[in-house]
């Protein structure tokens, strides 16, 4: 089968590899659609970050090259011995986190936690993948396979919002309106936030954020983003979400919050960032980070059935696996109009 495999920074190759075997407790899936995640782009441009290179990942026992892709949906084509809840023909989505004790407790914080499609175990940028039964969720009939490929990134956004102190009626700011930032806006709407400010330079992404109901703050049209948010809100937002991975933006996000406000860092960072402790201390603000998600896929699927996280609003391009590098990663690097690109194996 075909698979996109990470070999090194800026070296992802479409290769022919063996189809995965269906071992006991596992389910073999024919991949329908897989989204390109910001983490995939980080690995391509600046990796390895999560991909094991020098020593095997403790749970997959794999090192690079590894098959990439973790935002995917597909159809069950084979079930292993002992699988009870899935049958051939089922439409499914995959929660791609594996941990030492499976999906128990705070499994996203497990020291050995890994992502299928980054730490090994196969990936969605391939024709087939075989995964543990516990990683699967059935895709409701009313949701398309394209919509299914948005469940994983939507889980990141919903988990970020639900992990914050935000209450219905609160004001929020989202710094960065790439795919996750836009999904955070959707999650904030679902949580009952009133005014949602979107801080974004790209006119195309501003338009997407505005279509989702956000109030735009354009850094190119103001001398001071923080002052503008403070003026519009009467002192700052209750919660800010940093979704850029840009050092100067992190400080802006912290400063944009009100007294006792909170900043949630959603980004994965390639390098460090400098902040001034007094930005936190003097107004008794808090800053927290989130990694991935846990126990949230059912909530995402329920919200999708209500119309949130719509693929029609967020998917800007569909490509085939052979075009992943040029039309996928290349487009995301060069074209700021791109939001979510979906890939099908053939």
From Swiss-Prot:
CDD domains: butanediol_DH_like (cd08233)
Coiled coil regions, renumbered to chain: none
UniProt KW Coiled coil keyword: no
Gene Ontology CC: cytoplasm; extracellular region
Catalytic activity field: (R,R)-butane-2,3-diol + NAD(+) = (R)-acetoin + NADH + H(+)
UniProt note: phenotype after gene disruption: Cells lacking this gene have no acetoin reductase/2,3-butanediol dehydrogenase activity.
PANTHER family the UniProt entry points to: GALACTITOL 1-PHOSPHATE 5-DEHYDROGENASE (PTHR43161:SF26), SORBITOL DEHYDROGENASE (PTHR43161)
Quaternary structure and interacting proteins, as annotated: Homotetramer. Interacts with BrxC.
Family assignment from sequence similarity: Belongs to the zinc-containing alcohol dehydrogenase family.
Protein's UniProt name: (R,R)-butanediol dehydrogenase
Organism, as annotated: Bacillus subtilis (strain 168)
